[in-house]
Every structure is written in structure tokens, then in C-alpha cells.
């Protein structure tokens, strides 16, 4: 399942995003952020982080550098 979703994101990045243009206000872009989040945390939590990020990406936000959060070590 993870590989399929990551493949769909890559498809979007390679073929759809160039047509729509660069609209993301953040670095890394929302699609790259979601890709990295799914790689790091898995499909469920990574998708959750990606959706939260996409909802924050609008004309009224300043944007800027917003990396995927690091995994916290458990004690």
C-alpha cells in the first residue's frame, strides 16, 4: 500500500504539478512533505501529516521552511 501511494505522489510531481505550476507556499512542497512523511511514519500517520500541511497551504499563510517532524525517541 505504501509503495502505491508513494508512486501516485511521484506521478503527481512529475506529470500533474508541472502543468498546474508551483503554488505551494512552503519548502519542501506539500507533495514532497507528504512523500517524506509517509516514508518516515507510514501511510496512516504520514497521510495525516500531509493533509494537515495541505490545509495550512493557502494564500493567507506566510509559508516558509516546514520540514517533516523528526521521530521522537521513546524512553
Swiss-Prot record:
Disulfide bond annotation, renumbered to this chain: none
Gene Ontology CC terms, in alphabetical order: plasma membrane
Localization per Swiss-Prot or TrEMBL: Cell membrane
Keywords attached to this entry: Cell membrane, Membrane
Membrane topology, record value: Peripheral membrane protein
Pfam families reported for this sequence: YidD
Keyword Cell membrane part of the UniProt annotation: yes
Recorded superkingdom: Bacteria
SMART domains recorded: Haemolytic
Cross-referenced HAMAP family: UPF0161_YidD
Record-linked PANTHER family: MEMBRANE PROTEIN INSERTION EFFICIENCY FACTOR-RELATED
Entry's family note: Belongs to the UPF0161 family.
NCBIfam families in UniProt: membrane protein insertion efficiency factor YidD (TIGR00278)
Function: Could be involved in insertion of integral membrane proteins into the membrane.
Name assigned to this protein: Putative membrane protein insertion efficiency factor
Organism: Carboxydothermus hydrogenoformans (strain ATCC BAA-161 / DSM 6008 / Z-2901)
Amino acid at each position: 500500500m505504501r509503495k502505491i501511494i508513494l508512486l501516485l505522489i511521484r506521478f503527481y510531481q512529475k506529470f500533474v504539478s508541472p502543468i498546474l505550476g508551483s503554488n505551494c507556499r512552503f519548502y519542501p512542497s506539500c507533495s514532497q512533505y507528504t512523500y517524506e512523511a509517509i516514508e518516515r511514519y507510514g501511510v496512516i500517520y504520514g497521510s495525516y501529516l500531509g493533509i494537515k500541511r495541505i490545509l495550512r497551504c493557502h494564500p493567507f499563510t506566510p509559508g516558509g521552511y516546514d520540514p517533516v517532524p523528526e521521530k521522537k525517541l521513546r524512553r
